[in-house]
């Protein structure tokens, strides 16, 4: 298994149009997926109702590559820089909460991220479920939580509860924290 990594990202304060009488809400968040190849090559994708018909469209953002440490992980400073850019360009300047996945196959995730996707559906295929599908393609042995509430915020929370490291980024302070995580049983 390739020693690449990925972040299942949520922007928890992102204002989402529910297309109902409720209007906009910040209770569900918006999600994307950050792919980091073992050599530092970095790609970011998100899925949403960006097209006029609101059927769903994959967007990618140009971001800098990560600097990689001797143990194969992105440096904290390069990850902080990437998350700062994503907060501004994809998260409307809001906070980021992410589940960190290790030992995933970059090329398989990239293929999943860029292929034709099902039609957007708030319950059965939203931005969070898209990002999750990309990561699961990178390692089918990842422990999958039972997700009853498929909002982007909840999907990320469930994967953190499964033992993936929690990554927090505050655009206000510029601070990043990366938890330990214990997902080794599913990463071999």
Question: Residue spans of the language-model regions?
Answer:
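Glycine-rich catalytic cores of cysteine/serine-nucleophile enzymes that process amide/ester linkages
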Residues: 1-92
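A general marker of short, structured functional hotspots
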Residues: 7-10, 40-41, 46, 96-97, ...
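Compositionally biased, intrinsically disordered low-complexity regions enriched in proline and serine
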Residues: 12, 45-46, 51, 101-102, ...
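Short linear sequence elements within intrinsically disordered, low-complexity coil regions
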Residues: 16, 50, 55, 105-106, ...
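Second-shell loop/turn segments in exported
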Residues: 19-22, 92-98, 113-122
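Solvent-exposed, acidic/flexible segments
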Residues: 24-28, 72-75, 99-106, 120-128
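A structural motif
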Residues: 83-111
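Activation targets extended, charge/polar-rich intrinsically disordered C-terminal tails
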Residues: 106-188
């Amino acid at each position: 298994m390739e020693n690449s990594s990925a972040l299942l990202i949520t922007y928890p304060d992102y204002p989402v149009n529910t297309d109902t009488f409720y209007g906009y809400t910040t209770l569900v968040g918006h999600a994307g997926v950050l792919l980091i190849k073992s050599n530092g090559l970095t790609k970011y994708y998100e899925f949403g109702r960006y097209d006029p018909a609101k059927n769903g469209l994959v967007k990618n953002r140009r971001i800098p590559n990560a600097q990689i440490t001797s143990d194969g992980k992105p440096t904290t400073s390069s990850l902080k820089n990437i998350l700062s850019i994503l907060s501004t360009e994809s998260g409307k300047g809001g906070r980021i909460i992410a589940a960190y996945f290790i030992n995933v196959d970059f090329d398989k995730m990239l293929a999943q991220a860029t292929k034709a996707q099902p039609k957007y559906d708030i319950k059965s295929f939203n931005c969070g479920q898209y990002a999750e599908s990309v990561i699961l393609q990178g390692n089918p042995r990842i422990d999958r939580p039972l997700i009853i509430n498929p909002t982007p915020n909840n999907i990320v929370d469930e994967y953190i509860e499964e033992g993936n490291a929690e990554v927090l980024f505050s655009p206000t302070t510029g601070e990043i924290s990366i938890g330990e995580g214990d997902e080794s049983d599913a990463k071999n």
